[in-house]
Amino acid sequence: MKKLKAEAALKGPVETRRAGTDRSLRELEAATHRLVVRRLRDMLPGRIVTKRLILRAPIRGDVPELLRLADNQAIAKWLARLPSPYTRADAVGFVEILAQRPDERPYAITLGDRLIGVVGFSFAEGKVPELGYWLGEPYWGKGYMTEAVKALVEAAHKTGQFEIIHAQVLADNQASTQVLEKAGFKHRRKAKGEIGNSAGKPINVLELKRPRWM
């Protein structure tokens, strides 16, 4: 009986130390991830200029156009993370909170001085950078999204750090799939969506590898 009590007494501290070590390792991994993605984020240019567009950081002045364009079920139904209905609070939160997070790097797509959409990267722990985007419905069919995506992935590749970029689209979203294909993305696999509007629905995962010459 004394032996059993002694073993039980020893087991508690050992398990406590092991749990503490595991927690410390997870915290270290999380801190390392934050440093890595912040470095990736900061290596991207603050401003990207194309033939017709300027990609730049979202600003508070974008809120009215964000609200006008993003509050549209024709857009939201294709996106996993866009709230619907889209409120002024959502627009302000995007500009002042989400856009400032180290694991997000969104760009406002602007035509002249007017926001027409958003494109950017998310950096989830343990995953390659993921491209996401949306374009206001009045600007569909004019090649703006393809132009913006091509410019952003080219800028990412020029850093020398974005070896692979992923993108996920709902399987029946042909327009978005064509944008990615025109930018050089290749189909990688089929899957099921996990969050938001994509949850449980068939999705296509595409990827773009950095050209060897860059």
Locate each region found by the language model.
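Acyl-donor (CoA/ACP) binding surface of acyl/acetyltransferases
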Residues: 1-77, 106-214
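Generic alpha-helical scaffold signal
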Residues: 60, 85-89, 103
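Conserved GNAT-fold acetyl-CoA-binding loop/helix
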Residues: 74-96
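Short coil/turn residues that cap or connect secondary-structure elements
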Residues: 83, 99, 120-123
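A generic membrane alpha-helix/interface feature
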Residues: 90-92, 98, 179, 202
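Short loop/turn motifs at secondary-structure junctions and domain boundaries
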Residues: 97-103
